[in-house]
């Protein structure tokens, strides 16, 4: 499947929105409480700008270079942009001011670096803490038991506000197992909110992608990150 035309993207987003709404209602939730984040990794600014006319709530970027290029080109057309990939400390400065939310904070080292750059810029940066719920070595994210020390560290920062959690459960063809992972993340989300940390407001639970976003919504996600189902297969030859 190649990259989609605008009309194909429109049809895809309509179908995704319908599935999102159905999953929310099935769980007794308001469909309006779940945001659609378009993961636009490797897409050109023209494609991103065209998709901005669709009912997409926010754009998510995995690479700092692409965030900068699309933001500076005005490709998001006024819609929020989030950073959802692994963030290197030497690139934080470029993300601040371009990403309204950094979804992938997974260490005290990264927290401290964001705090330092945000203080220099005179801003408060919103972040999510990323949880590696499956304990996979191939993925970033903090283990569930290390979430609490990370929250302690985040609460002490003056220029960071934690707005929730992000997770990528293991790819699993077992629907029940997938939902168990998602439910575990939701439990952490609720527990974190109940602990009353300073500078922490558990508002956003980012989980669910093209293959499992309906399950994620059933298990409490407030934001789902979808790329391939919107844009088609990625053409990595277009990016260095």
Predicted feature locations:
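Gly/Pro- and small hydrophobic-enriched strand-loop and loop-to-helix capping segments
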Residues: 221-239
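Conserved alpha/beta-domain cores
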Residues: 1-187, 191-211, 219, 231-233
């Amino acid at each position: 499947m190649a990259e989609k035309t605008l009309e194909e993207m429109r049809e895809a987003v309509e179908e995704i929105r319908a599935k999102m709404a159905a999953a929310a209602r099935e769980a007794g939730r308001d469909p309006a409480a779940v945001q659609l984040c378009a993961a636009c990794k490797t897409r050109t600014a023209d494609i991103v700008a065209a998709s901005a006319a669709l009912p997409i709530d926010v754009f998510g970027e995995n690479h700092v270079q692409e965030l900068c290029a699309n933001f500076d080109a005005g490709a998001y057309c006024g819609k929020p942009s989030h950073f959802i990939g692994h963030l290197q400390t030497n690139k934080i400065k470029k993300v601040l001011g371009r990403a309204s939310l950094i979804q992938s904070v997974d260490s005290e080292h990264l927290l401290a670096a964001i705090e330092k750059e945000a203080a220099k810029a005179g801003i408060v940066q919103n972040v999510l803490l990323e949880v590696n719920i499956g304990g996979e070595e191939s993925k970033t994210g903090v283990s569930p038991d290390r979430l609490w020390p990370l929250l302690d560290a985040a609460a002490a920062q003056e220029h960071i506000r934690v707005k929730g959690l992000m997770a990528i459960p293991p790819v699993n063809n077992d629907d029940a197992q997938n939902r168990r992972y998602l439910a575990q993340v939701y439990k952490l989300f609720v527990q974190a909110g109940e602990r009353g940390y300073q500078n922490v407001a558990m508002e956003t639970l980012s989980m669910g992608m093209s293959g499992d976003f309906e399950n994620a919504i059933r298990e409490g996600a407030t934001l789902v990150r979808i790329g391939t189902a919107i844009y088609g297969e990625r053409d990595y030859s277009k990016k260095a």
